[in-house]
């Protein structure tokens, strides 16, 4: 049996789908890196997660030796720190700002050609703090840093996708 309410929902769904298609929306697929092979030096949690994501989400081959790679992703810095944002009326810390900063660049294997000049990504998260919940707040801090690391990996991959060979000499 035909009902006005059911057909209006179907019409609304069709209009919504047409609007989404018209604006260019599409689900995120594979990240197509502009390199056939990539070397990522280092042995830390950020590098491990970055390698996992590149291997899973692109056709780019990860290599162990920089000489075998079309591109080398080098890190210039990786810093995590915690800054006091506010104090309570009793003079105790009540809020922190967590910061995660990573600097990196992408060159060819010889370092002669720069695909992505030295870049820096800074992520921050605010965290309320209480002396009564020290263990819980330590766990929350670790969780926030892991979350920032995941975000960092995604942002680095987005920048790698946008990288183009350039003829800028390395400083």
Where are these regions (language model features)?
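Surface-exposed short loop/turn segments
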Residues: 74-120, 126-142, 158
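C-terminal/domain-edge helix-coil "capping" segments
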Residues: 135-171
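Classic N-terminal secretory signal peptides
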Residues: 11-19
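Short acidic low-complexity segments
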Residues: 60-71
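A structural "domain/chain start" motif
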Residues: 2, 6, 19-61, 165-171
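Short secondary-structure boundary/capping segments
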Residues: 29-30, 64, 113, 119
């Amino acid at each position: 049996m035909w009902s006005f309410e059911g057909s209006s929902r179907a019409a609304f769904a069709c209009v919504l789908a047409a609007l989404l298609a018209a604006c260019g929306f599409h689900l995120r697929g594979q990240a197509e890196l502009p390199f056939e092979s990539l070397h990522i030096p280092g042995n830390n949690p950020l590098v491990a997660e970055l390698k996992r994501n590149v291997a899973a989400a692109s056709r780019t081959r990860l290599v162990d030796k920089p000489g075998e790679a079309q591109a080398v992703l080098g890190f210039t810095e990786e810093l995590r720190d915690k800054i006091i944002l506010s104090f309570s009326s009793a003079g105790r810390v009540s809020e922190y700002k967590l910061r995660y900063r990573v600097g990196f660049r992408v060159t060819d294997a010889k370092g002669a050609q720069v695909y992505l000049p030295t870049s820096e990504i800074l992520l921050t998260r605010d965290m309320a703090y209480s002396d009564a919940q020290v263990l819980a707040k330590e766990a929350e801090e670790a969780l926030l840093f892991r979350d920032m690391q995941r975000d960092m990996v995604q942002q680095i991959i987005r920048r790698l996708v946008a990288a183009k060979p350039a003829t800028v000499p390395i400083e």
